[in-house]
Amino acid sequence: MTAALLPRVGIGVDVHPFSPDRPLWLAGLHWPGEPGLAGHSDADVVIHALCNALLSAAGLGDLGTQFGTAEPEWRDAAGTRLLTETVRLVRDAGYAVGNAAVQLLGERPKLRERRTEAEQLLTETVGAPIALSAATTDGLGFLGRRDGLAAVATALVFPAR
């Protein structure tokens, strides 16, 4: 099999500190009663990590490359808007998304109550299966101190042509 026909894998990471004066958006869902995250857009670490993984897999760089903070049209942009545009870029580059997995890292909020809802939204937005999981750091580091959230994602794309 030639390299042009092989699937490609990307890894994405995103980290944001909490910002109590902002709403919390995670995996495209609003989380009322939880402190938000600081960032140029909505700071949805789950979607940002997923976008980074998809862009990496397609050889398109990362969120900063595609939607930099110098671009005013992306200020306060919804993560779902960034994800939709990322999927378009991946497809325009000649790839189809096979699947992806994202793990949220932090002490709160607890993902379990809304995991299925989040997976459905992400899967519909991407047009491919997206698995979502979460883990704590058992009180270690900035995540354990509840200073912010992080997410790590992997994505598989394959040539669509």
Curated annotation (Swiss-Prot):
Q: Which Pfam families match?
A: YgbB
PROSITE patterns this protein is in? ISPF (PS01350)
Write down the required cofactor(s). a divalent metal cation
- Name the pathway it acts in: Isoprenoid biosynthesis; isopentenyl diphosphate biosynthesis via DXP pathway; isopentenyl diphosphate from 1-deoxy-D-xylulose 5-phosphate: step 4/6
Extract the Gene3D superfamilies matched here.
2-C-methyl-D-erythritol 2,4-cyclodiphosphate synthase (3.30.1330.50)
**Catalytic activity field:** 4-CDP-2-C-methyl-D-erythritol 2-phosphate = 2-C-methyl-D-erythritol 2,4-cyclic diphosphate + CMP
Q: Where does 4-CDP-2-C-methyl-D-erythritol 2-phosphate bind?
A: D14, V15, H16, H40, S41, D62, L63, G64, F142, R145
What EC designation does it have? 4.6.1.12
Q: Where is this site: Transition state stabilizer?
A: H40, T136
What Gene Ontology terms for biological process does this UniProt record contain? isopentenyl diphosphate biosynthetic process, methylerythritol 4-phosphate pathway; terpenoid biosynthetic process
Q: What UniProt keywords are attached to this protein's entry?
A: Isoprene biosynthesis, Lyase, Metal-binding
How the cofactor binds, per note?
Answer: Binds 1 divalent metal cation per subunit.
Which SUPFAM superfamilies does the record associate with it?
A: IpsF-like (SSF69765)
Q: Which residues does the record give as a divalent metal cation binding sites?
A: D14, H16, H48
Enzyme superclass (EC): lyase
Is Lyase set as a keyword in this record? yes
The GO molecular function terms of this record are: 2-C-methyl-D-erythritol 2,4-cyclodiphosphate synthase activity; metal ion binding
Q: Which domain of life is it from?
A: Bacteria
Q: Which NCBIfam families match?
A: ispF
Q: Which family does it belong to?
A: Belongs to the IspF family.
Record's subunit section: Homotrimer.
Protein task: Involved in the biosynthesis of isopentenyl diphosphate (IPP) and dimethylallyl diphosphate (DMAPP), two major building blocks of isoprenoid compounds. Catalyzes the conversion of 4-diphosphocytidyl-2-C-methyl-D-erythritol 2-phosphate (CDP-ME2P) to 2-C-methyl-D-erythritol 2,4-cyclodiphosphate (ME-CPP) with a corresponding release of cytidine 5-monophosphate (CMP).
Q: What is this protein called?
A: 2-C-methyl-D-erythritol 2,4-cyclodiphosphate synthase
